[in-house]
UniProtKB/Swiss-Prot annotation:
Entry's Gene Ontology molecular function annotations: hydrolase activity, hydrolyzing O-glycosyl compounds; metal ion binding
Positions of beta-D-glucose 1 binding: 176, 278-279, 349
Signal peptide boundaries: none
EC number: 2.4.1.391
Annotated Gene Ontology cellular component terms: cytoplasm
GO terms under biological process: carbohydrate metabolic process
Glycosyltransferase in keyword set: yes
Record annotation: effect of changing residue 176 to Q: Retains less than 0.4% of activity with sophorose as a donor and pNP-alpha-glucose as an acceptor
Protein name in the entry: Beta-1,2-glucosyltransferase
Reported function: Glycosyltransferase acting on beta-1,2-glucooligosaccharides. Catalyzes the transfer of a glucosyl residue from the non-reducing end of a 1,2-beta-D-glucan to a glucose residue of an acceptor molecule, forming a beta-1,2-glucosidic bond. The beta-1,2-linked glucose dimer sophorose is the preferred donor in vitro. Has a very broad specificity for the acceptor and can act on various aryl- and alkyl-glucosides. Does not show any hydrolytic activity.
Compartments where located: Cytoplasm
InterPro entries xref list: Class_I_gatase-like, GLMA-like_second, Gly_Hdrlase_35_cat, Glycoside_Hdrlase_35, Glycoside_hydrolase_SF
Similarity field: Belongs to the glycosyl hydrolase 35 family.
Length: 716
């Protein structure tokens, strides 16, 4: 199995292939039932099984390895691999070193953690160990033991890979790199990390004079420079943290490179993958930030396909936009790879969270509509932790397709239904596309926040007002972009694509009727120039809530302002504005950009009747600027987005009589699939027509059960 880059899907035996896998943890299941679980998985239409290979489970004590079940029958990894082959199932293996998976010590051997010196662990700014199971990724000690583990497990994987007629087709490198840093907001200040950081800074700036000019500091030499810590008080602190974020993206790339080179040295030629976390408390607004942390890996390792951890916990209208948004952002970041879900929720990790089969089935179909090209049901089979190995307790996952004893649960039939649809339609469905006339810009520097904002502890090191700013980048990307614009476009049934603004060209941008940018007060010169050229060459740009006048280090950079010939001031006003005749539009900040431009058309006003939004012809294109921030909390916000979209005569593909119904049309030159999605807990009955055929007869009535779906296939 390999990815088909030109159309971004997997290929198996020369044919388009939708990757359907199920997570089955051999070490959490009675070995007598292994075959039952595999057979029942295959009977759903899946052709792949996925599992971690816990280092702790197989290296019981230092140099005491067991892969054949000599000390415990569930350690017989080789037998499990052979069973996969016998059942004609491909196998995805995840040998760590980290596995997480609610396994004690995240899968690292307890003997190892006791033996490692303090300098092998991630340390806080005071030199204290952050957590007893959190090592410093590039610690020489840790890598030495990791390689010893690889020396034992990789020959087994190599022997059983596909080219040697084994079942193994894919391997995951480590697991959710950087996730602890995101959750805790604590950086690794291990001495080796700090030395690498200083090397990074020297390579980036070359001379201390160059750094001083950017930071507005007066260091005598690079020896005076320290890694940033604590709260941001000065602009120089902000600059240092910005570079610290850049450094850690390179640091993760270095770690992955070391692991990959070691793995390839064993003659392992299968596809490699890594998983991206980010769903938390039923929302995925943080997942794009975590995608950004892997940007250097994606740039330097095109042979690693990144997969999303799509774990919504409970699916609802409130988070229904999240899978599409994350799919689109990942596609923008690795445009030559299929979008797939390395962990695709099947069941629930926490007993108090209920994940019902009907809801998940609708989520699975919605993900197909939203362009997913493969997924791994996580967990397909429930597990029972070996004694002392469960992080939270004995049972691992609830409401799965199979319980640990291989009994079918309610989700099994839903998975089988979805899989059968995929297998029947995959050759056509994988070759379909969605017609998108709207493009949304993804600007990675707005996502550099994991080191200054704790997800779990809710600690913030950045107060933008202390730097003379008013737009917090985290609020911008979460509430204005992700939960605002992207949710609004999907709710209104407008298709959109996402583009990486730092890795695109003018030609690709001008192919769209509109480009939307949610912007802070800062943006680098190159991107400001790109947006200027986009408009001058005929593009339609919608920019809000601010025209950037600073670069990413908060130095003056007014390229957009000057090239567009606009003048404005920033001042406080009421939280409500009027725009396009829509009254009482609630804005997130009291501060607004107030425009003074006689050559533009006013489109939005404060309650003091000052102009806070304009449209202006520039070159061959048109600029629309809103100097206020809005998300999606009211119907006025949806109406405003709708008005902006219609400025350039963009239409929905269908007219649907019930606006609560979301729909997606995927098509190629042979087939059209119409997905109708009811994210509401009430039955919906409606008619639909193509937007180009509004005068023609309406369709027959369609009725969809509460929180369900309907797929209609039309042959052209």
């Amino acid at each position: 199995m390999k990815p088909h880059n030109s159309e971004k899907y997997f290929v198996k035996n020369g044919q388009p292939h939708f990757l359907i896998s199920g997570e089955v943890h051999y070490f959490r299941i009675n070995p007598k039932l292994w075959r039952n679980h595999l057979q029942l998985l295959k009977q759903t239409g899946a052709d792949t099984v996925s599992t971690y290979i816990p280092w702790d489970w197989h290296e019981i004590e230092e140099d005491d390895f067991d892969f054949e079940g000599k000390t415990h029958p569930a350690r017989n990894l080789i037998r499990f691999i052979k069973l996969c082959k016998e059942e004609n199932l491909d196998l995805i293996v995840k040998p760590g070193p980290y596995i997480l998976a609610e396994y004690e010590n995240q899968g690292l051997p307890s003997w190892l953690l006791k033996k490692l010196s303090k300098n092998a662990f991630a340390l806080d700014e005071n030199g204290n160990v952050i957590s007893p199971d959190l090592v410093s990724y590039l610690s020489d000690e840790f890598l030495e033991y990791t390689f010893k583990w690889y020396d034992k497990v990789m020959p087994i994987i190599s022997k059983h890979q596909k080219e040697h007629y084994g079942p193994i087709t894919m391997m995951q490198l480590c697991n959710e790199i950087g996730v602890f840093q995101w959750l805790s907001g604590k950086s690794d200040y291990n001495p080796k990390v700090i030395n690498l950081y200083k090397e990074f800074i020297i390579q980036r700036y070359k001379t201390i004079e160059k750094l001083n000019s950017v930071y507005s500091t007066n260091y005598n030499s690079f020896d005076d420079l320290k890694a940033p810590s604590g709260k941001i008080k000065l602009r120089s602190d902000y600059c240092a943290y910005f570079d610290f974020h850049l450094f850690f993206r390179e640091y993760y790339n270095k770690y992955i490179s070391i692991l990959k080179n070691k793995i390839r040295s064993f003659g392992i030629n299968i596809k490699l993958t890594h998983n991206i976390p980010g769903w938390i408390y039923g929302n995925a607004s943080e997942l794009p930030m975590l995608i950004s942390t892997y940007s250097e890996i994606m740039k330097n390792h095109p042979d690693i396909i990144f997969g999303l951890d799509h774990i919504p916990e409970f699916v609802s209208f409130r988070n229904a936009h999240s899978d599409l948004a994350c799919n689109k952002i990942l596609e923008a970041m690795q445009p030559e790879a299929p979008v797939w879900a390395a962990e695709f929720q099947a069941g629930t990790r926490e007993h108090h969270v209920k994940a019902y089969a009907k809801d998940l089935e609708t989520f699975y179909i919605a993900s197909l509509a939203h362009g997913i090209k493969g997924f791994n049901y996580y967990m397909f089979s429930q597990g029972i932790n070996p004694e002392g190995k469960g992080f939270y307790g004995k049972t691992f996952y609830f409401q799965t397709a199979l319980d640990a004893a291989s009994n079918k649960l309610a989700l099994y039939d839903s998975i089988k239904k979805v899989n059968r649809f995929i297998r029947k339609e995959q050759k056509d469905l994988l070759r379909t596309n969605v017609n998108s006339e709207i493009c949304v810009g993804f600007y990675k520097p707005y996502f550099f926040t994991e080191l200054i904002s704790s997800q779990l502890l809710k600690e913030k090191k950045l107060n933008v007002e202390e730097l003379g700013l008013y737009i917090d980048p985290r609020f911008l990307r979460e509430e204005i972009l992700f939960n605002g614009l992207l949710r609004g476009l999907q709710t209104l049934n407008y298709n959109y694509d996402v583009v990486d603004l730092e890795n695109c060209d003018l030609k690709s941008l001008t192919a769209y009727k509109q480009l939307w940018i949610t912007s802070a007060e800062f943006m680098d010169a190159e991107t400001q120039n790109l947006l200027s050229e986009f408009v001058l060459n005929g593009g339609n740009l919608i920019l809000y809530p601010a025209v950037p006048t600073l670069d990413n280090y908060l130095n003056r950079c007014e390229i957009l302002k000057n090239n567009f010939g606009i003048e404005f001031i920033t001042k406080d006003s009421s939280h409500k504005v009027s725009a396009f005749g829509i009254e009482d539009v609630f804005t997130a900040f009291s501060k607004k950009q107030i425009y003074n431009d006689t050559n533009s058309k006013p489109i939005a006003f404060t309650q003091e009747n000052e102009i806070c939004g304009i449209r202006k012809k520039i070159g061959k294109g048109e600029l629309t600027i809103l100097g206020f921030a809005f998300g999606y909390t009211s119907d006025e916000h949806l109406e405003l987005i709708d008005k902006l979209v219609k400025l350039n005569k963009i239409k929905r593909e269908l007219f649907v009589s019930d606006k609560d119904i979301q729909f997606v049309v995927r098509e190629n030159n042979k087939s059209r699939y119409i997905f109708f999605l009811n994210y509401h807990n009430e039955r919906k009955t409606f008619n639909y027509r193509k937007s180009s055929e509004l005068k023609k007869k309406k369709s027959e009535e369609i009725s969809i059960a509460p929180f369900s779906y309907k797929v209609i296939k039309e042959n052209k």
